[in-house]
Amino acid sequence: MKISLVVPVFNEEEAIPVFYKTVREFQELKPYEVEIVFINDGSKDATESIINALAVSDPLVVPLSFTRNFGKEPALFAGLDHASGDAVIPIDVDLQDPIEVIPHLIEKWQAGADMVLAKRSDRSTDGRLKRKTAEWFYKLHNKISTPKIEENVGDFRLMSREVVENIKLLPERNLFMKGILSWVGGQTDVVEYVRAERVAGISKFNGWKLWNLALEGITSFSTFPLRVWTYIGLFVASISFLYGAWMIIDTLVFGNPVRGYPSLLVSILFLGGVQLIGIGVLGEYIGRIYIESKHRPKYIIKNEKQK
């Protein structure tokens, strides 16, 4: 039985040797043929040479190198495209997702699950701000989007070959893999685990990238941000109508003069701000349509392992 580990890497020269050694020395994986697909996402350090050297000595290492930094989501998709295992497991190279969890994922899969999620039962290794913003994101996404995604589940999971083949059929270029992996469906099971500290290096995923990923997730699987502006427009129009009616009554019945310049200026600025925000939301969706319409490849591989 063949198990493929899909491992995106970006400037991870310190972590790759530790990860590789840990996988190869882990006794519970010895009964399986474990393929390791490294996807080098345009690294500037020695990452490419390290994974190429591993491939020379180990035929089960598949090194893929992008021509530039395309991002983690395209890297994951590339890994799924090139993984040949009966089951495929995306996993981070920093070993925060422990190798010891993999046998439990395989056990659930062999029991009949198409996808086995690895759920973090403890996020104490993450900062308070990251934990809180992740909690808000999951709640917002699951409130307005379909399908819902399991809270505290990252890319670490096991997928059957059937699930992987279904994912590979999807044509979109704007990728939010957590949503895509939930969208394909199938019988799903969960294994809980405690996330560890990084074994080496530092995280390359900063707050700005997380923010953009959150926007990608919401706009890829929900039209609610567009719909909400219809409601905001109705609300503003209703308030404006009521205020206009009040000014007429106040002038005709009570004889009070109409307040001029200040109220007019505030109204114009308020409506201008609302319109700009609405245009910005609309622009996010139009931009994604524009990118999809070009039909560019999700990634470009510089070199592949020579058979």
Curated annotation (Swiss-Prot):
GO terms for cellular component: host cell membrane; plasma membrane. One of its GO terms (molecular function) is glycosyltransferase activity. Its main location: host cell. The chain crosses the membrane at residues 229-249, 263-283. Its EC number is 2.4.1.-. Keywords: Glycosyltransferase, Host membrane, Membrane, Transferase, Transmembrane, Transmembrane helix. It is a multi-pass membrane protein. It is found in: Host membrane. It comes from the Viruses. Involved in O antigen modification. Catalyzes the transfer of the glucose residue from UDP-glucose to a lipid carrier. Belongs to the glycosyltransferase 2 family. GtrB subfamily. PANTHER family: PROPHAGE BACTOPRENOL GLUCOSYL TRANSFERASE HOMOLOG, UNDECAPRENYL-PHOSPHATE 4-DEOXY-4-FORMAMIDO-L-ARABINOSE TRANSFERASE-RELATED. This is Bactoprenol glucosyl transferase. It comes from Shigella phage SfV (Shigella flexneri bacteriophage V).
